[in-house]
Amino acid sequence: MIKICTVYFEDDWSSYTPDYVGKLYRSLLKNSTIPFEFICISDTDVEADIVLPYNHYSDIKKHWHKLKYFSPHFANQKPGDEIIIMDIDQVITGNIDDLIGYPVLDNQFISYGTWWPRKIKVNGGFYKFKSGQFDYIWNDFALNPAYWQSHYYENGDVHYRYYGEQNYVNWKLYEKGVKVIETPKEWLGKYTDNKKDMVEMNKMYSKISNTDYMILDDVNEKIKVVHFNGVNNTIHKYKENFIEKYWG
């Protein structure tokens, strides 16, 4: 069984709404022929196959709850299950059978292939692995969540407190000598409201994909997912045609 796992929470820091979960869920269903179970840790009602409680009173903050899915004892995981962890700030723009069905063997870790400059290998928007095979990511974090949740901010690796979850995952994989396998880079698009950045990103994407553009009025046909990562880079603030066409 493929389990696609997400997190949603409401607080003063987050500007997402519950329909982000539902839109991602419906888009995945519409654009895949592969059966999966969609799970969300949430503090409010959301559209999913299974909704698990988000605890605001625990030591675990914000999106760090994603790490719970690395435990084989969480979300009714069974041996052999393929676990996918996704962020909800993504728009599915085409068939994703190749993405969610991306082959994963024992002790392999799959993440988005990215084409822009980054200091780490993993991309927190998409992880795929077999249930329980990286349980130390959760186990080690659970020993001292307060330390890890502040470490990357205090170290200057991220610019906002409680960011750095993907940095932690990247470090634990590096520590254990795990090679991160990237999905094809041309499958992933990126969007921001900074027009200058979008021009440069279109150039970078065109170079790696041997095409003329990433996103203009529509997205390039090679793209399967557009990620709106970044603080306050919410999908619902945009009026672009491709968002109206594909989002939910």
Where do the language-model regions lie?
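A structural signal for short, well-ordered beta-strand segments and their strand-loop junctions
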Residues: 39-41, 84-87, 92, 109-111, ...
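N-terminal anchoring/stem segment of glycosyltransferases
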Residues: 1-62, 74-79, 131, 230, ...
